[in-house]
């Protein structure tokens, strides 16, 4: 019986639901569950609901819902059943088996699902289906639609899981893992169980008892009102702050975390608030995120909580260049000018802020939009109880101020978006582009104030603003006309200016609107509070003449204020006139007379517009004013009505498309108002991030491409298709993004084009850190991280001439098509003339080598030949009647001859070939005849720089290794007496006719690393610290691999001012316990004890090597105690798995840098991508190895390469990419799995007032690394917690300590070590000898140091340093894990429920399970390989003996024959 239970647990077998019928739930209870994201899945066609049974899932009547029908989307795209306490799983080895519930961390079934347009989709494109009328299965054959029972929208996707970020604990702020197992129970939400203080907490891995990673959760009961125990209150301002200094999140993650706690990222409104924050974090050497950001591409810097930005304390190093990627703000309390900008993807601690008397920022003060009829003097414009006058004489700011004062007015102050709208209209009517406004600063730090003394309650900064001019005592502000945005301007410049003064307010009766209607501009508005369907509301009867249409952000803000006055329900909605009238997915305005009008502005909520065929309503709250698609027939809402102030006949105006042709080589088609240009990697210097690409387009006066309607998307798709090989996965940035934190998570176009269709599938809902979209040539958009680098497409209005940037090198209008460029000459000439012209342009007359190329050429010459013409191609007879050959020497592998034409062989003249623009067929003609022709080139004109010239292969001496065009010697002598310092290594290489190696690519780095397998001795390479940007051979450093990545020149911290600096030289690490494998770091050049790598140029003088005779890669390879098998066949990922199994292997898993490097070299030689065993079922959020291996090692191409599909391949540089599993690749890599060792350290950590992380048999607290304490104070703190200061006893422990504090980023510099340095030796204060030390570049000489020195560890360099014992720095506590401790809960508060009998029973059970597991393990080792987990990802390093690679796979036949 015990054996059966254990096997079921290990297999992750289907969970059995509780015996007996589950209690029925009332409709009210079901609706309550829905508020928590828990729903019932109903078949749309069969009207029955999915219920978890004892062994299978079935369809049952929905009339008596019970807990076994309740589902919830949880972490990793899992679907969790509340009653069955298990996750929906698909057995991939037998997909036809009915679906069941499994342990939620099972590795033997697929647990990941996606909801997409009423379908639930798993791996292999299997969707949830119904079999035999009520059995739930997964199949790829049919499509079954599912809806949410008793839900207004019926959308099963609306409750998709959103990460819940933790605070405190020991997880550095990482999100909760739901469900997580604690005390033998799966929790799908935060719990108070085990907490004496009743706080909500969660685990951040699936099993708390195994990993002990946890943190506190936001408390929903206190998020809305007040400041509970997790906030610190400023009694003077009644503002609360939350200091998350142990967390390490990206900006967007920190933004989400603050919102979940009912607050927002920190905004700083004045110097007093900044001083308060500085005082609170004064003891922490930490840089933190604030809410400052520049993520709205159409605006400037802003606070994420909407607070006006009028106080500034920028660091002098801040850059306002458009190409700089730092768009998120930080605060550093240790600096007087404390504000900096950072890359938003960096991970940092953060501070949240919450107002006690908080009012929703989007509920605008209604009075700002209320219409007041106002009377003014002649020449002054009335608006909202004030009078305004644009003075059309240019003056400096101070002159303008005094001029207004002289007319009893002031320079205009602007307090709302309503007033911005008025100013834009005023400037537009007067044809003025810019004006002074009354905002200025005369202080430092900068604090902008209105000249009339009114408070700054609103700001509207322009892109890259406010820019601060150094050494300026006064800063002044102007406003531009197009959007009313502000910018900081030199006060001595001259501009028009606007004066403002109070007017005479008239009665409400003079507004021009009927009673009950509100006026804005030339229209009157009213809310019909009766709930109606869209068809009734839009009929014109209840809302004459029509529902509201919204033209711009100003009208939207007015509508929002109007709604706020009547909203008293949580879920109130208001119909507007927007509808997908033709069910095409494109939304248009439905106006009076049932006519359609195009959309000029949109204001969608997150994940909207979700579907086609719907009608649009405005949300009344949370967030107010946002648009959502609703069912036109069944959904009921109030109505927003709109009518003109004066009845006037609407002018029917014909919309005229501009007919101006596109300038230069921009492209369009008839009927489109814009021109497009594709910037792909063949034509530009580099791929770029989204913001860099947008700035690149702006240099031309353009923006990243948008799609105003389906015709534009179709054109862009047609533009891409012929350019690139269809097997290529090309991705291009377009303007679609949701970067702006004030935009409620909705997507928008960077050029302001309205979003009139649903461009993203429901697949991507909930993934809120991929904020920018790329376009793929299969008409799909894919969200990616904005910091990843891609190609891009720009768009510009057809009648706007593109600007020519100074760096742009214009090329003739060559057309790119699949790795070649073509220049079409429609003017006729003889064949030899074109041979000369094409040659002069470094090209050849056209060659055609495929049907695709033929199709491309024919399409172009048809368009260029109005009446039909023949065009020369590059086939020519060498002599009369000779065989035709391509002039560029390439073989004739494709032909398309006209077989009807007579081919006489009696011609006296030399003939050349042509192609007909009518038929596309080829024929011959005398070369002297005049025809148009086409040039073709393979070497591209790069608009930013030209390419390098090719090199030649040669031979290498015996014992040296071939790599690319180099010979490499990897020398790690077995005898330590032959190890060398850097100078000796350099001289040795010189004597051999070479130099120390210059590593110039990732593949070369991998080649060297793979040849160091089994070594623990690092090797010298050709760099020195006095010129680390140039290799010893004189080449610039184009590739680098420093450890850590942002540190190049590490100083010697144990060197005093009296000692001369040590010259430093670069080593490549093959000892992962001190530096990560393959990484570079600096060491004392004179220190002996290292190997080295030499390089020299291959000898091409004797005879050139034909690389085609290099040894082919064998199908079976041995490396590093592993056996690999290479499968060469065109196959999908699934076929690759089966093929590996047929060869007695598994699709490869890669767990360390050595084996990754080996495979990188192999893939580089093979020349094409291969499948590996990594896959995902949740759009790239989490990945698993198909052989069950657990490893944290990754090698992605970039941060977004994991989001492109469900299955993974390695490219020819070894980097990993995900793609569609059904894609065909030319091969796969298999391996014969090795046995893994069982988990060896089951002990638990005791509970104290600080959190602990376990490694092997010790526990560590990293919560104190940001504290500042002397050595003695730190020692006493740890002692009170029943622990000691940190000691480092072996290499594995040192490796663990290198990795774990990386989560704190640059915030952690040094921590104390529990040791003393006496008589040139280190002694641990716990009495154990210090066998392990790491002084780095130089061991300290005590003669040069003051007394009372203590030992510290520098993070992240990992070296030891002497520091005065009284110095304040961070520290880490360490204690032994205790198997006798029974953990009742994480965090604060010791457990007092330890019962000796329970301890004894626990030991007996553990021993029984270990004995039984060992027995089963012996019976089936292959099965247990799949069960190996990663409870602790740090294992003792195996001391491999040096592996002698008898024949390196890159040695050529020539060397073998020497």
Swiss-Prot record:
GO terms for biological process: oxidative stress-induced premature senescence; positive regulation of arachidonate secretion; positive regulation of cytokine production; positive regulation of DNA damage response, signal transduction by p53 class mediator; reactive oxygen species metabolic process; receptor-mediated endocytosis; replicative senescence. Residues 227-356, 374-502, 511-645, 660-798, 815-939, 954-1098, 1117-1231, 1243-1376 form the C-type lectin domain. This is Secretory phospholipase A2 receptor. It comes from Oryctolagus cuniculus. The chain crosses the membrane at residues 1394-1416. The lineage of its organism: Eukaryota, Metazoa, Chordata, Craniata, Vertebrata. A motif (Endocytosis signal) lies at residues 1432-1438. Residues 171-219 form the Fibronectin type-II domain. The secretory phospholipase A2 receptor form may be produced by the action of metalloproteinases. It contains all extracellular domains and only lacks transmembrane and cytosolic regions. It is however unclear whether this form is produced by proteolytic cleavage as suggested by some experiments, or by alternative splicing.
